[in-house]
C-alpha cells in the first residue's frame, strides 16, 4: 500500500471515528537506525462492526492488539494497519520499530560534525506523524497526547507539554513523562531530544526555553530571543 491518504479516505474516516487519546512511548536508546514506538489509542466508532485503518510507516510492528485481541501479521502492510469489526469504544495498542530520518520527515536524526553530538527532532507536517507512532494521521481527528520518552542520560527531552516526571537514571538512560495535552492534530505534536544547550526564561508565569546545539551556543543572543518571544 502506498504511503498516501486520499481526500475521500480522510473524509470517510472523519465521519466514522472520534479519537479520544493517545499514549505514546518512545525509546530513543535502541541504536542509530531505529527506535521503539508504543502507541495506545482510545477511539470511538459511529458504526460498530465497520472497518477502517490506522497509519503507521515502519520497518516492523511486533505487536498489534485491538480490544484485547491480537491482529494477524498481514493486517500491517508497512504503511497502514487494517482494523476490522470495530466496536463502539475501542482500544488499540501497537508496538513498532520505527526508522530515523535523515531528510526531515518523521523523527530526524542529526550528528553534529563538530563534536559528534546526536540530536533528534520531529518534523510531522503535514503527513509524517505516523512515521513516529501509529495514528489516524489527519488534522481533523484531534485527540489528547501523552508522551513518555526514554533517552540517554544527560540529554534534554522536549515535547508539547512541560515534563512532570523525570525519572532517575537507569543504566545509561533516563525516562521523561509529559502529561496529557489539550486536543490537537497529529502533525502539531513534537518531540526533540539530545544534549541541547538550554537558555531558560519566563513571561507571565509561562516558562520559555531556547534550545540549540552545544557547538552553536546562543547565550550571547538569548536576551534578544527571549524578549522577542515574550512579544
What are the functions of these language-model segments?
Residues 1-231:
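Acidic/His-enriched low-complexity segments
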Amino acid at each position: 500500500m502506498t504511503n498516501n491518504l486520499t481526500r475521500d479516505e480522510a473524509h470517510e474516516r472523519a465521519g466514522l471515528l472520534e479519537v479520544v487519546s493517545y499514549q505514546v512511548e518512545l525509546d530513543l536508546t535502541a541504536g542509530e537506525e531505529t527506535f521503539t514506538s508504543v502507541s495506545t489509542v482510545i477511539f470511538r466508532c459511529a458504526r460498530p462492526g465497520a472497518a477502517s485503518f490506522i497509519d503507521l510507516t515502519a520497518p516492523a510492528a511486533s505487536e498489534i492488539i485491538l480490544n484485547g485481541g491480537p491482529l494477524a501479521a498481514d493486517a500491517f502492510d508497512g504503511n497502514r494497519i487494517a482494523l476490522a469489526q470495530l466496536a463502539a469504544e475501542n482500544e488499540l495498542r501497537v508496538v513498532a520499530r520505527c526508522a530515523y530520518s535523515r531528510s526531515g520527515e518523521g523523527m530526524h536524526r542529526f550528528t553534529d560534525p563538530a563534536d559528534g553530538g546526536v540530536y533528534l527532532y520531529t518534523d510531522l507536517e503535514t503527513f509524517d506523524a505516523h512515521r513516529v507512532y501509529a495514528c489516524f494521521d489527519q488534522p481533523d481527528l484531534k485527540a489528547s497526547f501523552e508522551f513518555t520518552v526514554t533517552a540517554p542520560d544527560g540529554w534534554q527531552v522536549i515535547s508539547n507539554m512541560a515534563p512532570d516526571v523525570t525519572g532517575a537514571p537507569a543504566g545509561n538512560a533516563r525516562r521523561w513523562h509529559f502529561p496529557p495535552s489539550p486536543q490537537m492534530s497529529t502533525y502539531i505534536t513534537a518531540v526533540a531530544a539530545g544534549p541541547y544547550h538550554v537558555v531558560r526564561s519566563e513571561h507571565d508565569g509561562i516558562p520559555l526555553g531556547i534550545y540549540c546545539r552545544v557547538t552553536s551556543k546562543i547565550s550571547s543572543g538569548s536576551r534578544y530571543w527571549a524578549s522577542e518571544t515574550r512579544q
